[in-house]
């Protein structure tokens, strides 16, 4: 009887030890050991995009600075935005870092960093368009990036039931091309992108004053990767303190927009 009890206790102890091993968060150590951090991004200027074959943008520059502090290489992998969570969970990327809005629904699938950027959802339309408010979207064809905050904001708005059609695009740049070609009447998107588009072609576009809502951007990690998330937050705080983040923000926006 005593021998049987000893065996049962031994099995229980081994099981508990295995559970402890399973619960150890090696997310940060794994990155350091392999010497590389894989960042998922999409075509979303000015946060992250390709220009002349090179990956660039505000988020890209901040990520590179984080990599230097951490002592690892940063690999940028282009992803379909509507498959971002699948890419993360499959281990194809270590994080989503490209104007990712923090929402309660996304928190169920994604572990977020501290907010690092504030943004609003606005309407982008052609300079000579009669659209000057959200209500003017009624009976219009409105473009959005698939699975974006712009899509969510439009669907949740009072005007949604009266628009002619919501046209979904894989990337926001595709929506802009269609807007310019006359395929749609307006786009609902992040203000930071809309202002970037206007800055590039001030004579082509305008942004009505009325906004849908305000939001914060965060970096998205796997739910269990707390150690990695905490370290990235710590490094970004340091970049804000030593002036590196300010320099990057001034480069892209002409002012300090980092929420740290």
Residue map of PLM features:
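Extracytoplasmic small-molecule ligand-binding "clamshell" domains
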Residues: 20-99
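Ligand-binding cleft/hinge of the Venus flytrap
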Residues: 49-50, 63-72, 150-169, 198-202
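Extended ligand-binding regions for polar small-molecule ligands
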Residues: 17, 21-22, 60-69, 135-136, ...
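Short helix-initiation/N-cap motifs at beta->coil->alpha
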Residues: 25, 75-86, 129, 166-178, ...
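Periplasmic-binding protein-like
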Residues: 117-125, 173, 191, 195-237, ...
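C-terminal motif of bacterial Sec signal peptides marking the signal peptidase cleavage site
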Residues: 12-15
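Acidic, polar ligand-binding/catalytic clefts
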Residues: 64, 68, 73-136, 206
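A ligand-binding cleft/hinge motif common to bilobed small-molecule-binding domains
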Residues: 83, 100-108, 152-157, 178-181, ...
């Amino acid at each position: 009887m005593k021998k049987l009890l000893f065996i049962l206790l031994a099995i229980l102890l081994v099981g508990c030890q295995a559970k402890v091993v399973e619960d150890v968060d090696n997310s940060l150590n794994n990155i350091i050991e392999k010497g590389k951090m894989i960042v998922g991004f999409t075509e979303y200027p000015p946060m992250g995009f390709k220009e002349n074959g090179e990956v660039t943008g505000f988020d890209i520059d901040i990520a590179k600075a984080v990599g230097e502090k951490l002592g690892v290489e940063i690999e940028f992998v282009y992803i379909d935005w509507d498959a971002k969570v699948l890419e993360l969970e499959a281990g194809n990327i270590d994080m989503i870092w490209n104007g990712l809005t923090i929402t309660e629904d996304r928190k169920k699938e994604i572990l977020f960093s501290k907010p690092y950027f504030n943004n609003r959802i606005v309407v982008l339309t052609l300079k000579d368009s009669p659209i000057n408010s959200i209500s003017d979207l009624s009976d219009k064809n409105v473009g959005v990036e698939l699975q974006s905050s712009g899509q969510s904001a439009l669907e949740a708005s009072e005007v949604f039931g009266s628009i002619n059609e919501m046209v979904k695009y894989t990337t926001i740049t595709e929506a802009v091309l269609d807007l310019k070609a006359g395929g749609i009447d307006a786009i609902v998107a992040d203000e930071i992108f809309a202002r970037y588009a206007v800055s590039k072609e001030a004579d082509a576009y305008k942004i009505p004053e009325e906004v849908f809502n305000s939001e914060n951007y965060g970096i998205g990690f796997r739910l269990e990767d707390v150690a990695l998330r905490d370290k990235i937050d710590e490094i970004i705080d340091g970049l804000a303190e030593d002036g590196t983040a300010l320099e990057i923000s001034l480069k892209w926006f002409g002012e300090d927009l980092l929420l740290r």
